[in-house]
A protein has these predicted regions:
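C-terminal His-loop and adjacent cap/lid subdomain of alpha/beta-hydrolase
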Residues: 1-325
């Protein structure tokens, strides 16, 4: 795959690994020390999520046609890049326009969650399929409004106190944008809620919520509301009660494609914040109400309510909202 592997290589080894690992984990002499897993899920982020497209279409389907039990009980694909989905036994990516990288088989529940970044830049729009309850293609698709593929939390905060892993591989995540504020939307909370929805789907037969997708224009850019934020999608309080415009991109200081994935925030003026929310006390009350609504819709875990509220309020204070506590 361009930028990710050498042209003379292909991804055969990973298919073996993805197939053999769950089988080994289910053996009594496995590396889990005799603990037998009740269920095994496969989760992938970004390019790893794109590999799941190839794996489900070919290997999971082959198991089904041969009468074998599924090796996984559920699929969780987060921020996948369909444009990077490799063709079987080849180094080249599959043809998005021809629909080769569309999910055609799952066998067990498959939940796919995107940020706003992937629509045009990573081929999601061309590969998207409709939600399905077909027994062989139980599938849900979501886009987290306000979120971008790369964000402050995943690219900076997680490594704040320990950069040893980055040192080992010589890769350092630096915000590339001219805009002063990188995207700091708390999309991890949405992913946690989505994963819980998948667990409930597999273990309890409880179907995930239906969520209207982010609306897009003809050029695949996302349609915006009066604040410049996305319409539709998986919505957390910070997009329902915004204090900034969440841009899908940042403007690189030097020529680079990294800004297409690393979003930015444009704060509202203090006057606009006061006009919308009065003061911090009133804003907190509104966020708490929206958090409870999101929990009721299964878009936010009850365990994340406090963190969700505090994150939103802290950002409002950061961008100039005052008054109360």
């Amino acid at each position: 795959m361009p930028g990710a592997s050498f042209p003379e290589t292909e991804d055969g080894l990973i298919w073996d690994m993805l197939t053999e690992l769950p089988e080994r984990l289910k053996r009594e002499e496995s590396c889990l020390g005799g603990i037998m897993p009740k269920r095994i899920y496969l989760a992938g982020w970004s390019q790893s999520g794109s590999l799941m497209i190839t794996y489900t279409n070919y290997f999971a389907k082959a198991d089904f046609e041969a009468g074998r039990k599924p090796v996984y009980d559920g699929w969780f694909s987060a921020g996948p890049a369909p444009a990077c989905a490799p063709a079987l036994n080849q180094s080249e990516c599959m043809d998005a326009e021809a629909g080769d990288n569309k999910i055609r088989f799952a066998g067990v529940p498959y939940l796919e969650m995107h940020t706003e970044s992937e629509n045009a830049f990573l081929g999601t729009a061309a590969a998207k399929i409709d939600d399905s309850d077909d027994p062989q293609l139980q599938y849900r698709f979501y886009t987290i409004a306000g979120a971008t593929h790369d964000a402050k939390s995943t690219m900076r905060d997680y490594y704040h106190d320990d950069r040893s892993d980055q040192d080992k591989v010589g890769v350092f995540f630096v915000y590339p944008g001219k805009e002063p504020y990188p995207n700091d939307f708390p999309y991890g909370m949405a992913y946690c809620a989505g994963l819980k929805c998948l667990y409930d789907w597999v273990e309890k037969g409880m179907e995930p919520p239906k969520v209207e997708d982010v609306s897009v224009n003809a050029d695949l850019t996302n349609q915006k509301d009066e604040h410049g934020n996305a319409l539709g999608g998986w919505r957390l309080p910070e997009i329902e009660l915004p204090v900034c415009t969440y841009q899908q991109f940042s403007t690189p200081l030097v020529k680079s494609e990294s800004g297409a994935l690393y979003g930015s925030e444009i704060p509202f003026s203090v006057e606009k914040l006061k006009g919308l929310y009065q003061d911090v006390t009133h804003y907190r009350r509104l966020v708490e109400e929206k958090a409870d609504e999101a929990i009721g819709k299964r878009l936010l875990l009850p365990e994340d309510r406090e963190a969700c509220v505090e994150h939103a309020v802290a950002k409002a204070i950061k961008y100039g909202l005052e008054g109360g506590c």
